[in-house]
Amino acid sequence: MVSRRKAPRSGQSEQWVLLAPESLSGDAKNLSDETVFVKLRAPFADKGAMFLFINSGQQICEVKAFHEEYRSWFIGQTVQQDGRLLIATPIDPLFLVLPYLIKADKEQGKFQPVEQIVVDEEFPSCGMLLQCTPVAKSLHHVTEEKEIGSKKFHKYSKEKALVWLKKKVDQTVKVLKSSKVCVGGGVQSATFIRSTQGSDVKEEDYTRYAHGLISEYLTEDLREDLSKYLGLPDLSSPTPEPPVKKRRVSDAPVEADEDYTKYNSDNKSRKSNSKMTAAQKSLAKVDKSGMKNISAFFSPKAKAAK
């Protein structure tokens, strides 16, 4: 649990409930100067996201919030109105630097000091990434380097980046297998039913699943390039349905194959067109002159004129 120094009007310190790595298990007061929340540009979208810098950036975590309506926390003898659950998961900071390297390569296409590459007016705290030891140690995985005197210059290398990302995918595949995470057709995401891992699961299923996880932190272009580099075939499109079945499930009105309005004529016309029996033929020959219709016997008599 992390607490802010700023206190609201009620005098109660503002707090959150945070699930974090064990490296943050010490007293929050002792870590307040070395551990901070920083808003940076998310590598997977052109918007801000919250990250946690632990021990002056020696470890960086992505922070996500689980929030439900009408939720609060009981902390000691107090009620914390903000009922969000913050979850901090470690992330390789090179994923946060990669979009800046790609952008600089597209715009300038030359070797530059990394301090001139990782610049963002909207998120000025991005400079803190360069103070992280993991970034300095891993830049060579995704860039070409030149050293002039004591100064290093970097330029994004797509080939190196794909090799580095493939290693990330391979590591993820190993974790998926060791954790017995179901992939492929054995997963039903709607209900999250874990079925027995069948023999039909292929290595490609693990690779595609791992690629999907890694791609959440990549730009769209790099995501597609990685898919091709891994040799993942495009997912086959669904088999086209027969024309009759298409028409049945279509939202368009069903079209009749025959004009059924010809059966809408009245009974009299149908009877006249039908074949008459012998009795009906004999009755038709009888002289009906002077005969009254049977309905005439039931009609009211006309009043005589006075």
From Swiss-Prot:
Keyword Nucleus: yes
InterPro entries to which the protein is assigned, alphabetical: RNase_H2_suB, RNase_H2_suB_wHTH, Rnh202_N
Record key words, sorted: Nucleus
Keyword Nucleus: yes
GO BP annotations, alphabetical order: RNA catabolic process
Subcellular location field: Nucleus
Family assignment from sequence similarity: Belongs to the RNase H2 subunit B family.
Subunit structure: The RNase H2 complex is a heterotrimer composed of the catalytic subunit RNASEH2A and the non-catalytic subunits RNASEH2B and RNASEH2C.
Protein name: Ribonuclease H2 subunit B
Species, as recorded: Xenopus laevis
Species lineage: Eukaryota, Metazoa, Chordata, Craniata, Vertebrata
Gene field: rnaseh2b
